[in-house]
């Protein structure tokens, strides 16, 4: 879902509920920042850690980025989550719309990456969302958790790295060896997810991981691919 008012656009998703004070909580940041990511509560009411730091050369989120917001009260980020993202309309005009070819997964990450080329997106501690459904997960030492996902997601997690690489190429950020290592790490993470959280889908999940990885190579070498154009 999307809603817009004045010169700002906000985005949300279907498995989160917007807090009544969400707009007011984000409004105080709009005077000095063009892209703002609010925080959220997990399904159980506890804080939800979101990986705001994207390691561009590897093409993976940083799982150990500090959760504290520090003296400024916010963290600069180079990614985005469509659940609770707020961005000024002139940013959309400069970078274009989100790329629908991703279908699912990495689309919001890459939209935040594109936005970071024209402004400094931030994530703030103000809670504006609450998750509305419980997701099976593996708790990692009480610090991070690895959530359950579907085979369709597994396929697109791997396939869409082809699109990701193309955007990195268009901005001069593509490093083949490091990105390839990031793809290997991504595949390893998905295999671990299968073993620890989604074991009943191990056979079909491995097939989708391999298929998505194979198809990403086709996208990487597609001669007709072009990035999403700016709106103005």
List PLM regions with ranges.
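Short, flexible, basic/aromatic active-site loop/helix in glycosyltransferases
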Residues: 39, 55-78
């Amino acid at each position: 879902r999307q809603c817009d008012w004045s010169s700002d656009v906000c985005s949300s998703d279907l498995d989160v509920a917007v807090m009544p004070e969400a707009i007011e909580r984000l409004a105080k940041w709009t005077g000095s920042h063009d892209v703002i990511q609010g925080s959220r509560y997990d399904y159980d009411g506890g804080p939800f850690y979101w990986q705001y730091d994207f390691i561009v050369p590897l093409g993976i989120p940083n799982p150990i980025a500090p959760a504290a917001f520090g003296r400024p009260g916010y963290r600069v980020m180079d990614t985005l989550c469509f659940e609770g993202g707020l961005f000024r309309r002139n940013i959309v005009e400069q970078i274009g719309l989100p790329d629908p070819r991703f279908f699912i997964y990495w689309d919001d990450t890459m939209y935040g990456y594109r936005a970071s080329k024209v402004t400094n997106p931030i994530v703030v501690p103000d809670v504006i969302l609450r998750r509305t459904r419980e997701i099976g997960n593996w708790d990692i030492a009480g610090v991070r958790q690895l959530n359950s996902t579907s085979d369709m997601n597994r396929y697109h997690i791997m396939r869409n790295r082809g699109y990701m690489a193309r955007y990195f190429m268009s901005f001069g950020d593509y490093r083949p060896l490091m990105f390839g290592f990031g793809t290997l790490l991504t595949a390893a993470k998905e295999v671990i997810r299968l073993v620890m959280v989604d074991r009943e889908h191990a056979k079909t999940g491995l097939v989708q991981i391999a298929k998505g990885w194979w198809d990403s190579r086709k996208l990487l070498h597609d001669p007709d691919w072009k990035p999403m154009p700016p709106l103005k």
